[in-house]
From Swiss-Prot:
GO terms for biological process: proteasomal ubiquitin-independent protein catabolic process; proteasome core complex assembly; proteasome-mediated ubiquitin-dependent protein catabolic process. This is Proteasome subunit alpha type-3. PROSITE patterns: PROTEASOME_ALPHA_1 (PS00388), PROTEASOME_ALPHA_2 (PS51475). There is a cross-link at K100, K199, K231 (Glycyl lysine isopeptide (Lys-Gly) (interchain with G-Cter in ubiquitin)). It comes from Saccharomyces cerevisiae (strain ATCC 204508 / S288c). The proteasome degrades poly-ubiquitinated proteins in the cytoplasm and in the nucleus. It is essential for the regulated turnover of proteins and for the removal of misfolded proteins. The proteasome is a multicatalytic proteinase complex that is characterized by its ability to cleave peptides with Arg, Phe, Tyr, Leu, and Glu adjacent to the leaving group at neutral or slightly basic pH. It has an ATP-dependent proteolytic activity. Signal peptide: none annotated. The gene is PRE9. It is found in: Cytoplasm; Nucleus.
Amino acid sequence: MGSRRYDSRTTIFSPEGRLYQVEYALESISHAGTAIGIMASDGIVLAAERKVTSTLLEQDTSTEKLYKLNDKIAVAVAGLTADAEILINTARIHAQNYLKTYNEDIPVEILVRRLSDIKQGYTQHGGLRPFGVSFIYAGYDDRYGYQLYTSNPSGNYTGWKAISVGANTSAAQTLLQMDYKDDMKVDDAIELALKTLSKTTDSSALTYDRLEFATIRKGANDGEVYQKIFKPQEIKDILVKTGITKKDEDEEADEDMK
């Protein structure tokens, strides 16, 4: 009961030095759909489990977990979608202002730091609450190449080779740590992401309508960085190719959605 004296405002520390509102925000993320980021030698893979599925959703246009910030940076989100939308729009504005001012794309870490500063500010001002969302940032710039970061509601951000946020993150992180290799390619990273999600997802079967996938990699011919968000049919084909979902199971899932 004593803790309730310290959790009504974000600016009040408990006797143990804890900010309960930040901890509550972190707890809300642990119930969100799992999101995974894996950095390969030739690109980055983002994968996420959707929590909202419905036969009424337009599968080709609706996104819940993956968003494009600019041509070279994308994010996967875990937590409150409304909070994520505010930060995503802010990130896009920062990226465009940087491009307008310097005539080049914003470096990945600079954008991550700016968004993390905003998150941190919401933990120390009265009348505000922390953003209830964690991000996995995937991007590329000429100075550091491919980069993968996470940030949480406290405003802390860290760089990773492979990371999971959301539900069952401890189990997912253990699997990633066991199977990740520094020299793996994007195709291998896609298989690892699917394997991890298939073993940690709360649903009984991993189906294409519950997944979102994106990659960031250089084009084979021109060397330009391209960002791709996979369509449902492409995700279905990958599931069949990797053997995680059999073809007849996908056909049954399609029948259920009709």
